[in-house]
A protein has these predicted regions:
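Short basic/aromatic active-site micro-motif
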Residues: 16, 131-149
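C-terminal catalytic core of Y-nucleophile DNA break-rejoin enzymes
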Residues: 60-80, 98-122
Length: 190
């Protein structure tokens, strides 16, 4: 994650790019969700970046994909900076900032499609030499990390399922990557 974030500080749209990556790896969002998220979904009633993503069904997969995902502190900080840029850009063009506008926009200010987000990830991982990675890799990383930390924070796999927006725990379990070292430690602790 650190290597990717370091690389993203060098891109032309670095703040947007950092937010795209963090939405995937820290919030476990799908490409479609990243493309569809609006400022309204990440702000509080006063218009400040809130403490959670209130992902609506329209932005998610299926009619029951809406969910609330607490904001990781790094993602929250990145969203605050990106929002400052977005507000300034709108005002520069003579338009008021609109909370219903998309968080992630193209260089020209238009909405990015899920396909564009998927291609963005493909280019990113290709530039970094990460073969076999896709727009879903960050989501898998987030879900695996949540699962590994669940018992430490007093949660359950049901919490991971809810964060991931899966209707079935079996689907969530398919995302969780096995760890040989963790298996060894589990056997040794009992």
């Amino acid at each position: 994650i650190r290597t990717t974030l370091q690389f993203l500080t060098t891109t032309r749209n670095s703040q947007r790019d950092i937010v795209v990556f963090l939405l995937s790896v820290k919030s476990g969002l799908r490409a479609k969700e990243i493309a569809s998220i609006t400022w309204q979904m990440v702000t509080d009633p006063e218009g400040n970046i809130g403490d959670a993503i209130a992902l609506q069904n329209v932005a998610s997969k299926g009619k029951n994909g809406g969910r609330t995902i607490p904001l990781n502190r790094d993602l929250k900080a990145a969203l605050e900076i990106l929002k400052e840029f977005a507000v300034a850009k709108r005002l520069e063009k003579g338009f008021p900032f609109d909370l219903t506008s998309n968080v992630i926009t193209s260089e020209r200010g238009g909405r990015m499609s899920a396909n564009s987000i998927a291609h963005w990830f493909k280019r990113l991982y290709g530039n970094l030499g990460f073969d076999g990675c896709s727009s879903h890799s960050g989501r898998r990383t987030a879900i695996t990390r949540w699962a590994k930390n669940t018992s430490r924070v007093g949660g359950s796999l049901k919490d991971v399922q809810d964060l991931a927006g899966h209707s079935s725990l079996a689907t969530t379990q398919r995302y969780i990557q096995s760890d040989t070292e963790a298996k060894r430690k589990l056997v040794d602790c009992g």
